[in-house]
């Protein structure tokens, strides 16, 4: 957007720089965010990418300090190290706020790895992105994405039937995945199975794909 660059502050650490410096980046960014949120009553958005590189830097530094590694060679302090960052998100009574959106890249697609596993326990929700072979797009996976705050919005700031529409949509998408499994295992598909597969492709293309940009009411 025009004029957006005047409102952006960037803190950058490249792979050529020492890992210990990478550990300072989130704190530096959040310190700047706190200034604008607290002192200026601004609504601040903090984008942190990539937190996997941050956690890897934690692992490198802790190993050099001869600390005993935990799961996946991560330091035992990984949970608290991530929590002190994500818990800086706040809504202040005076009107200022800090919203944090962090990117965590999975190691070999492993969602059980210590980094995404700990992240999932701390954050108020996550959008799980994956490539969808049927639509050929990168989509938000409805089965692995979640929001712990959706009840504050659904049916209150959106349509009354938001929850029902969402649950029905995801259920049909799940039925499509079951139909796909039947097809892969050589079973015959019913008319309902075929319609679910058609629905899943349309759902992924028109709703779940990350290049879709429509309003919630239109989506519903």
Q: Model-predicted segments: where are they?
A:
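Conserved catalytic/coupling modules of large nucleotide/cofactor-utilizing molecular machines
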Residues: 35, 53, 60-220
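Short hydrophobic alpha-helical runs that function as membrane-insertion/retention elements
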Residues: 9-12, 45-46, 126-131
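Loop/turn-to-beta-strand initiation segments
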Residues: 6-9, 39-45, 95-101
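Phosphate-binding/switch loop-helix module in NTP-utilizing enzymes
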Residues: 20-58
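Nucleotide-state-sensitive switch-loop elements of NTP-binding domains
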Residues: 1-35, 64-75
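Fold-independent oxyanion-binding glycine-rich loops
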Residues: 13-15, 50, 103-104
């Amino acid at each position: 957007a025009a004029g957006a660059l005047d409102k952006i502050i960037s803190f950058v650490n490249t792979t050529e720089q020492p890992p210990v410096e990478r550990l300072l980046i989130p704190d530096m960014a959040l310190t700047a965010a706190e200034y604008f949120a607290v002192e200026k009553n601004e609504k601040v958005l903090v984008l942190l990418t990539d937190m996997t590189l941050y956690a890897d830097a934690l692992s490198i530094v802790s190993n050099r300090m001869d600390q005993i590694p935990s799961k996946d060679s991560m330091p035992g302090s990984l949970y608290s190290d991530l929590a002190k960052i994500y818990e800086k998100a706040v809504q202040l009574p005076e009107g200022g706020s800090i919203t944090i959106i962090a990117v965590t890249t999975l190691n070999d697609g492993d969602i059980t790895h210590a980094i995404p596993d700990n992240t999932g326990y701390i954050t108020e929700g996550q959008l799980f992105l994956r490539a969808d072979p049927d639509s050929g797009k990168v989509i938000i996976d409805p089965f692995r994405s979640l929001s712990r705050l959706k009840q504050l919005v659904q049916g209150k700031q959106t349509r009354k039937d938001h929850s029902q529409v969402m649950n029905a949509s995801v259920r049909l998408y799940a039925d499509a995945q079951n139909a796909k499994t039947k097809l892969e295992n050589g079973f015959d598909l019913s008319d309902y199975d075929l319609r679910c597969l058609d629905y899943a492709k349309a759902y992924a293309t028109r709703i779940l794909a990350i290049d879709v940009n429509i309003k919630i009411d239109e989506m519903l």
